[in-house]
Amino acid sequence: MTSNVAYLDESTAAGWERTLYAFLAEKQRRSDSLRTVQSYQRMLHDFFGRSGKTPDLVETQDVFAWAYGVGLSGRQPSSITIGARLACVSSFYRFLIRMKIISSNPCDPLERPKALPGAPRGLTGAQIKRLLDVVPGTPVGLRDRAIILTLVMTGRRRTEVISLKAGSLSIEDRVYYTYRGKGGKTGKRELPPPAVEAINSWLACSGRSLEVMAPDDSLWPNLKSGLAITSGTFYTNLRRYLKAAGLQSGGVHLFRHSAAKLRRDAGETVEEVSSFLDHSSLAVTSTYLRRLEGQEDRSWEKVAAAVGILAT
């Protein structure tokens, strides 16, 4: 590919680095997701580091070899990983084309593999109780218990809960929390009392309280550093709790599934669950719940009777 340099100087490695950071800055502004930007940054640095080429010299086979190649884990990439790699590199090249820096995208000839999503699952109320029963009464355990209850009671996503700060909570006639969700969507909702009580217990155990914490203080600080824990820290602990409770391993999103299913089981309508989850449409929620609950077969008895294996 030939380089059609616009206002950025790509004649040096430093110039290309500035272009990369310009792309990441735009990506963060558009997606409002630091996690997405960090993921793109890691993948792009890995790709260009392995290829040893500047963006204007990259060819389709370079992208293919990297996307389908073994990563740092030493394992063959899944279809989801391959798709994410291709999407990342392609997005960067679309940016370069829009900026009139290059004229073509080396990802265009490549087809993304079909990813078969795993069936979502949620924990039952009894399973969540089993899980909470194995969480220790230590300061870390009380913190993790508060996180679990906040996830289950609010149905918010992992990053939305982990990023909560003292200033995210407001005490009025009830306790409310503000959040920034997917796509930059913001909201203010009641924080159910079980989550409030768990948070207060955890903060009291660690010598903190909402009344004296600074607005920017994380609700989930590391006991040693005082800095906010990462979602990876919580996930590591969660895996241990699930194993101790005799439950199947799963990610943090398991609690969003659980929250949706428990609300539905409690009698909420699809419309109410959709609003609870901040879904973009009822169709999204209907599909979400159908995959969680399974679809009832109301005609199997008639079919069985027709073939003579069940008496009517």
Where are these regions (language model features)?
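Conserved catalytic core of the tyrosine transesterase superfamily
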Residues: 1-312
